[in-house]
C-alpha cells in the first residue's frame, strides 16, 4: 500500500496519457497496467467540457487524475496552469513540471522550487518533477511537497536509470515518497527502481509507443510487483569476494 498525502494506492505504477494512438487504446493500457493515478497535460485537455476526448474516458475509467503543468517555462506559468486545473477538474493534486528548453525537457530547479513553495501555501498537493539532485529533492520536501519525482533519464529517452547513484541518495534521505519519473524504457527498469527503494514509478512513453501497449502495460504492472516483492524479501548484500554456497572440502575429508 502506497500513501501520498490524503490518498492510498494499491498500485505502485503511475501512468501517463500522451503518445497513444487513440483514446480507447490509452484507456485499455491504463486498465491493463493496474494504475490508479494517471497524469495528463493541461495543455492537451479542453477544460471547458468533460466530454473532451482524453478527459471523458479517464473519468469513466474511475482513475485518480494528476494534472501536470507540462509546457510551463516559468513558475508563474505553472502556478497559473495549476489554478486552471483545480477549478476545472476539482482536484488540488498537481504534478509540477517546468522545463524551459523544449529540446531537452529538463526541469528547471530554481523555478520548480519557487512554484512548489507557492503552490503548497495555496493548498495544492504538489508532486514535482525534478532532476535527480538530492539537495533539491530535500528542499522540495522541506517546503511541503507530498512526494518528489526525480528523473531516471530525460523524458521519453527510454535510457533507464542513468541517475541511479543520485536516486539512491534521494531515496535514502527522503521522508516523503519517491516516484522515479522519466526515462524508464522497459519493465526491467521499473523493477530496478522498486528494488532500490523507490516508492513508485511513472511510465508513459515506454507503454504508449510499444507495438502492443496493452501487453506492455501488463508487463510494467508485473515488473513493479516483482521489484516491490524483491525489496520486501530482503535481498542479500553485495560483496567483492566469492562466498561458497556449500562446503568446499568437507566431501574430501569425509572420504579420506
UniProtKB/Swiss-Prot annotation:
Entry's EC annotation: 2.8.1.10
Reactions accelerated catalytically: [ThiS sulfur-carrier protein]-C-terminal-Gly-aminoethanethioate + 2-iminoacetate + 1-deoxy-D-xylulose 5-phosphate = [ThiS sulfur-carrier protein]-C-terminal Gly-Gly + 2-[(2R,5Z)-2-carboxy-4-methylthiazol-5(2H)-ylidene]ethyl phosphate + 2 H2O + H(+)
Subcellular location(s) of the protein: Cytoplasm
InterPro entries on file: Aldolase_TIM (IPR013785), Thiazole_synthase_ThiG (IPR033983), ThiG (IPR008867)
GO MF annotation list: thiazole synthase activity
Pfam families hit by this protein: ThiG (PF05690)
UniProt cross-references to SUPFAM superfamilies, sorted A to Z: ThiG-like
Keywords per UniProt: Cytoplasm, Schiff base, Thiamine biosynthesis, Transferase
Active-site feature positions: 95 (schiff-base intermediate with dxp)
Gene3D superfamilies reported for this sequence: Aldolase class I
GO biological process: thiamine diphosphate biosynthetic process
This protein's GO CC annotations: cytoplasm
Subunit structure: Homotetramer. Forms heterodimers with either ThiH or ThiS.
Function description: Catalyzes the rearrangement of 1-deoxy-D-xylulose 5-phosphate (DXP) to produce the thiazole phosphate moiety of thiamine. Sulfur is provided by the thiocarboxylate moiety of the carrier protein ThiS. In vitro, sulfur can be provided by H(2)S.
Family as reported in the entry's similarity comment: Belongs to the ThiG family.
Protein name according to UniProt: Thiazole synthase
Amino acid at each position: 500500500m502506497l500513501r501520498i498525502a490524503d490518498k492510498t494506492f494499491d498500485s505502485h505504477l503511475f501512468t501517463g496519457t500522451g503518445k497513444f494512438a487513440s483514446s480507447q487504446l490509452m484507456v485499455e493500457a491504463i486498465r491493463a497496467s493496474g494504475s490508479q493515478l494517471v497524469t495528463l497535460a493541461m495543455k492537451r485537455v479542453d477544460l471547458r467540457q468533460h466530454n473532451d476526448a482524453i478527459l471523458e474516458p479517464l473519468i469513466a475509467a474511475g482513475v485518480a487524475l494528476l494534472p501536470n503543468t507540462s509546457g510551463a517555462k516559468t513558475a508563474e506559468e505553472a502556478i497559473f496552469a495549476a489554478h486552471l486545473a483545480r477549478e476545472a477538474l476539482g482536484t488540488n493534486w498537481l504534478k509540477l513540471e517546468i522545463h524551459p528548453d523544449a529540446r531537452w525537457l529538463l526541469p528547471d530547479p530554481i523555478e520548480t522550487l519557487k512554484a512548489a513553495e507557492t503552490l503548497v501555501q495555496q493548498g495544492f498537493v504538489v508532486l514535482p518533477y525534478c532532476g535527480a539532485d538530492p539537495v533539491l529533492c530535500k528542499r522540495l520536501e522541506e517546503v511541503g511537497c507530498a512526494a518528489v519525482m526525480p528523473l531516471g533519464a530525460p523524458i521519453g529517452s527510454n535510457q533507464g536509470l542513468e541517475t541511479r547513484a543520485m536516486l539512491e541518495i534521494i531515496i535514502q534521505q527522503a521522508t516523503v515518497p519517491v516516484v522515479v519519473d522519466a526515462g524508464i524504457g522497459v519493465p526491467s527498469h521499473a523493477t530496478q527502481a522498486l528494488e532500490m527503494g523507490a516508492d513508485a514509478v511513472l511510465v508513459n512513453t515506454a507503454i504508449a509507443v510499444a507495438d502492443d501497449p496493452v501487453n506492455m502495460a501488463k508487463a510494467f504492472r508485473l515488473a513493479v510487483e516483482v521489484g516491490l516483492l524483491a525489496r520486501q524479501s530482503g535481498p542479500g548484500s553485495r560483496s567483492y569476494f566469492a562466498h561458497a554456497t556449500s562446503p568446499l572440502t568437507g566431501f574430501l575429508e569425509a572420504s579420506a
